[in-house]
């Protein structure tokens, strides 16, 4: 890591939702997934998002990831109203400020770990040397520099998720959004991935937002947001990261 000193949350919200609703369909088929969500995420925080299926957590994460927009309400990112942006502007914001990690890794099967990590930089237009240098540095951060030339089939599930995390951080995003990042891993590999995310959060200051169904994984977060019936039911703060593991 670039620094051995932990970077605490600033207390200032990098993300602020006020009265956010999301409605799908119309008439008899209309469904309100979010019913007025208020939520502040401090810069540098590690937040776990929990709740039963249909509670609104995935819809909220899609909005926070600029993959969807609210039907009503306000979404501020770094103080800027996101609901005023068009599709192309939201795509630019995603590329510049956000990194994504998925349950299923979403790696290209026929390309090396290095080439997978380079992809966001390729889309951004970086030259070949800059891409390689940055991708190797990201792989080194996740402990996989020596596996740079291996394809996903030659890597374990935990290693594949590390490659996916390297791909997510290679652009130095402000926020990392992780959707069930340990869902396809055994308990030992799950803890390793959570320790890696917690380390990135503490030492790099990256804000981590993670959806999980597992309390043991949520214990790595400083803040746990509980959703129920399209609303934030409660927010637990002041967690000691990894306390229950």
Regions found by a protein language model. Name each.
Residues 1-23, 233-245:
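ABC-family P-loop ATPase nucleotide-binding domain
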Residues 13-227:
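ABC family nucleotide-binding domain
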